[in-house]
């Protein structure tokens, strides 16, 4: 890792021996272990360990779960909120497990579209609800810091499965709950 940073510092015209940079390779290596720890965790295990037989057959919504991830194209952060709604069939999941699922997938190199899809597909596979919807809203620093340099752009993605895809009333109820 040190060789990587020495080459990086040289390429940008920086002195690798400058006082403020001496410990940078070690600090960044520790940071990267944290930022990309999602590769070492199984999202399916996180969900499987936190569900129980349900007594609810109405919509459940976990709203505005904050996250940050790293864009795989530019290695810059994107951050925002994810909301998950589902209608149980037999299994109810602990709310912290939804947050854990989001954290595992977001702590990987990502694009927002795949992040949203992975959360919905894993939830659908493990919990087997009558329907699931995932809505992700994020600000991308790659869009703010370079290229088009749009500071306030928010990107929204959604993935719908089951009743949320088939029934417009179910989808509308979820959207209304997000607004309230």
UniProtKB/Swiss-Prot annotation:
Gene3D superfamilies: 1.10.286.10, 3.30.1130.10. It catalyses: GTP + H2O = 7,8-dihydroneopterin 3'-triphosphate + formate + H(+). PROSITE patterns: GTP_CYCLOHYDROL_1_1, GTP_CYCLOHYDROL_1_2. It comes from the Bacteria. Zn(2+) binds at residues 71, 74, 142. Pathway: Cofactor biosynthesis; 7,8-dihydroneopterin triphosphate biosynthesis; 7,8-dihydroneopterin triphosphate from GTP: step 1/1. One of its GO terms (cellular component) is cytoplasm. GO terms for biological process: one-carbon metabolic process; tetrahydrobiopterin biosynthetic process; tetrahydrofolate biosynthetic process. InterPro entries: GTP-CH-I_C/QueF, GTP-CH-I_N, GTP_CycHdrlase_I, GTP_CycHdrlase_I_CS, GTP_CycHdrlase_I_dom. Pfam families: GTP_cyclohydroI. GO terms for molecular function: GTP binding; GTP cyclohydrolase I activity; zinc ion binding. Its EC number is 3.5.4.16. Keywords: GTP-binding, Hydrolase, Metal-binding, Nucleotide-binding, One-carbon metabolism, Zinc. Homomer. PANTHER family: GTP CYCLOHYDROLASE 1 (PTHR11109:SF7), GTP CYCLOHYDROLASE I (PTHR11109). Belongs to the GTP cyclohydrolase I family. This is GTP cyclohydrolase 1.
């Amino acid at each position: 890792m040190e060789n990587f940073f020495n080459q990086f510092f040289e390429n940008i015209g920086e002195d690798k021996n400058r006082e403020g940079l001496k410990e940078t390779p070690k600090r960044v290596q520790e940071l990267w272990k944290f930022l990309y720890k999602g590769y070492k965790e199984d999202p399916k295990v996180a969900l499987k360990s936190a569900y129980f037989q349900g007594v609810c057959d109405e919509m459940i919504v976990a709203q505005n779960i904050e996250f940050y991830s790293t864009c795989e194209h530019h290695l810059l952060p994107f951050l925002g909120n994810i909301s998950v709604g589902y209608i149980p069939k037999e299994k109810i999941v602990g709310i912290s497990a939804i947050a854990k699922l989001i954290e595992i997938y977001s702590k990987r190199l990502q694009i927002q579209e795949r992040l949203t899809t992975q959360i919905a597909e894993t939830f659908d596979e493990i919990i087997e609800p009558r329907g699931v919807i995932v809505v992700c809203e994020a600000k991308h620093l790659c869009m703010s810091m370079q290229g088009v340099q749009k500071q306030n752009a928010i990107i929204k993605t959604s993935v719908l499965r089951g009743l949320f895809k088939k029934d417009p009333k179910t989808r509308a109820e979820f959207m209304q709950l997000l607004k309230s």
